[in-house]
Regions:
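Charge-lined substrate channels and their catalytic hotspots, especially those that engage the 3′ end
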Residues: 1-282, 289-335, 373-374, 619, ...
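Electropositive polyanion-binding surfaces
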Residues: 31, 185-186, 213-216, 220, ...
Length: 716
């Protein structure tokens, strides 16, 4: 840019910054500044440049106002309805971006944004000024061919435009194929994004293509490189006497694993005895680091994956199966190397002593949650007879589990007990049933024992002042909690914020206790959860708000979570006397990156798992067009009523399908009221609905309310 242009920019910007400046259009500016006709184009160029820099902003009426010049950098998240948000690290609230202010940004891009509006008590609005880095190179979608070209409709609705594909770059794809398209142009200068087909996944109706599309869409690694597989085969050798040297031998201890029936990667085993009024609990975790050496091909691949991903019809493991289901899995009757946390716990649930040690274990029985539930809750004769010798230990487990749970409750730990779904598939991968996940005495035993082991290990290493990886859950943002408190007042609930600013876990726990069994329980629980921050990994011990503890880590699942594998490595270096200054410096250097990377990979896995679950629920419900169901109103918005069925499927009764009256949304009381007949729909209300539509692409289900016979008689 020449010197004159920059000078003009400076003069005009100073003019707009003047306190007496009144927002005006380009024509008005031109007249006021007495710009000659032949230079109006230059004025427009100056204003465009200032706008691009974020120094000025154009209102919806076309008037120029001063913009906030501070550039913020963050991640752009698009919304299927055409707008988006920028999430800035360290900022408590996202920035709203209108369709006109996206500046060509796409889902997942790293962008620079300036604040254009920050109204009191409302969400900030901004304008994207620069795309720092594109977040997506490849997109999965449905291919549609035309005469001389084709286009891909993205599966992910957050990608707001179809991708144009020239015929010569279609790789022979035909209409109906699910494909992976690589972007060659991001749609600059008002053009559509353009790409080339790099992989055809199969026809949309082919078995397994639906989930394969999700796998590819989230860029989940599937096949292991040959080098990694070869290394896994080499290290997966049976445990020898030499391997056991220097380890605590606990093979004679009565030991069990308790997992789901279909679990194959068994990374935790339990031992439990009682001496006087004290419990001796052993949580024995597979010693994966014995087989996965730091910076080996196996280790690099595990870090790249971050976690195993559990989808409806498949598991994408973090480690090759020869390790995850073989030598690292604590299979019954096999000698296995472990890292154990052996705790002495008093009658109040306090850990009064503990030992973290390298051990050798040999599991007596591979138990399932169902079997243990049958023994402890159902007193099933057949199961009790089969596992007669283990029953005293199971009874002790139930006893200690209750003590530990009560202790957590006393200190204020929060337990969001949302119903989870298990999808039952046939051989073709089609859903044939949906069952609510059974959270029973057996699942609670394992949950409680893993939690206490994780806390114990975290506290031990915090006080040793050794570089470590913690699982942190920070205190919720003050503004979000204030909004939640205001919302709760509509239902007659209160939550005390200390000093009017900080919330304590105990207050959230009290709220959940109060709403238990009420019509509004589901909605308030969800809103409370959304008001929380996401748990993440960190080298700093910032505490865990949800568990109401200062010390927490992930120690118990090194087969399927990289952070657990990472801290096992640190623990073993320490136990073996290798934690010298060089090692400390090494861990201090790598842990921030490991924490950030694994937190991100965990979120990716969670999203893929959620999408798969939503997809399979829609596929299941398409078999029930026109059928009626009993459900409960789980949410109410201005566009309709959300109804949840007993099997956890949720669908929307859109307000346009509520045809017996004109319904208005009462935002203050979260209800729908008919303007003529005054019929009211409230949270938690039982309703009967008919399934009228479902869409696999948007993963949505539509219901229509069914009149009860009594209502029909009254109408007649």
């Amino acid at each position: 840019m020449d010197e004159l242009f920059e000078k003009r920019k400076k003069i005009i910007y100073e003019f707009i910054c003047d306190e007496f400046y009144v927002p005006m259009k380009l024509k008005e500016l031109s007249m006021l500044l007495q710009v000659p006709k032949d230079q109006k184009g230059e004025l427009k160029a100056v204003m465009d440049s200032l706008e691009k820099e974020g120094k000025v902003h154009v209102t919806q009426k076309g008037k120029y106002i001063k913009g906030e010049a501070k550039q913020l950098r963050g991640m752009f998240q698009a919304n299927a309805r055409g707008f988006g948000f920028v999430t800035v690290e360290g900022e408590s609230e996202d920035i709203f971006i209108s369709e006109d202010d996206m500046n060509g940004a796409m889902q997942g891009d790293e962008v620079e944004v300036v604040i254009t509006e920050a109204p009191e008590g409302k969400r900030r609005e901004g304008k994207i000024t620069k795309i720092v880095q594109r977040g997506t190179q490849r997109i999965v979608g449905y291919y549609q061919s035309r005469k001389n070209f084709g286009f891909v409709v993205p599966d992910n609705e957050r990608f707001l435009q179809d991708i144009f594909v020239p015929a010569e770059r279609s790789k022979g794809a035909v209409t109906g194929h699910k494909v992976v398209v690589e972007l060659t142009s991001y749609g600059e200068n008002g053009k559509k994004p353009e790409g080339k087909i790099v992989e055809i996944l199969g026809h949309v109706t082919d078995p397994g293509v639906d989930i394969l599309s999700i796998v590819k869409g989230y860029d989940l690694p599937t096949e292991f490189p040959e080098k990694v597989l070869n290394q896994a085969e080499r290290v997966a050798k049976a445990v020898t006497t030499a391997d056991m040297a220097g380890r605590k031998d606990v093979r004679s201890w009565q030991t069990v694993t308790i997992d789901g029936e279909d679990a194959k990667d068994l990374d935790d085993a339990i031992t439990l005895t009682k001496e006087g009024d004290r419990y001796i609990l052993g949580v024995h975790i597979a010693d994966v680091t014995n087989y996965v050496q730091e910076n080996s091909a196996l280790d690099r691949e595990a870090l790249k994956r971050g976690t195993s991903v559990y989808l409806a019809d498949r598991v994408i493991p973090m480690l090759p199966r020869v390790l995850s289901n073989g030598m690292c899995s604590l299979n019954a009757g096999e000698d296995r190397l472990a890292l154990s946390c052996i705790m002495t716990i008093d009658a109040k649930g306090n850990v009064v002593d503990h030992q973290i040690a390298e051990t050798v274990v040999n599991v007596d029985e591979r138990m399932s949650y169902t079997s243990v539930k049958k023994i402890l809750e159902d007193r099933d004769e057949e199961e009790c007879e089969r596992y007669h010798d283990l029953i005293p230990m199971f009874e002790l487990m139930k006893e200690l589990s209750h003590i530990l749970r009560e202790r957590r409750h006393r200190r204020g730990a929060i337990d969001f007990d949302f119903p989870e779904a298990k999808i039952i598939l046939n051989e073709s991968g089609e859903p044939v049933d949906i069952k609510a996940y059974d959270r029973n005495v057996a699942t609670k035993i394992i949950e409680d024992f893993m939690l206490v082991a994780n806390e114990t290990v975290a506290e031990d290493y915090f006080w040793q002042e050794i570089p470590f990886l913690y699982r942190v859950h920070e205190t919720p943002d003050e503004d979000k909690m204030k909004k939640l408190v205001t919302f709760l007042q509509n239902f007659g609930y209160t939550m005390h914020m200390q000093g009017g600013q900080e919330i304590r876990p105990k207050e959230v726990q009290k709220l959940l206790d109060k709403i238990e069994g009420t019509p509004e329980e589901a909605m308030i629980s969800r809103l409370a959860l959304r008001s929380m921050k996401q748990a993440r990994y960190s080298p700093d011990n910032d505490g865990h708000f949800g568990l109401a503890t200062q010390y927490y880590t992930h120690f118990t699942s090194p087969i399927r979570r990289y952070p657990d594998l990472q801290i096992h490595r640190i623990i073993k270096d320490n136990l073996r006397g290798r934690m010298n200054d060089a090692k400390r410096h090494h861990y201090e250097k790598i842990l921030p990156e490991v924490a950030m990377e694994t937190s991100s990979l965990e979120r990716r896995a969670d999203e893929a798992e959620r999408e798969t679950l939503k997809l399979k629920k829609v596929q299941y419900m398409r078999n029930f067009f026109g059928q009626e169901f009993e459900g409960v109103i789980s949410g109410i918005t201005k566009w309709g009523i959300y109804v949840e069925l007993p099997n956890t499927v949720e669908g929307l009764v859109h307000v346009t399908n509520m045809t017996d009256d004109h319904y208005d949304y009462d935002e203050e009381h979260y209800q729908m009221i008919g303007s003529h007949h005054r019929k009211t729909y409230k949270l938690g209300q039982k309703v009967r609905v008919k399934m009228i539509d479902c869409d696999e692409i948007s993963r949505t289900i539509d219901f229509r309310l069914v009149k009860e016979r009594k209502e029909e008689r009254e109408d007649g």
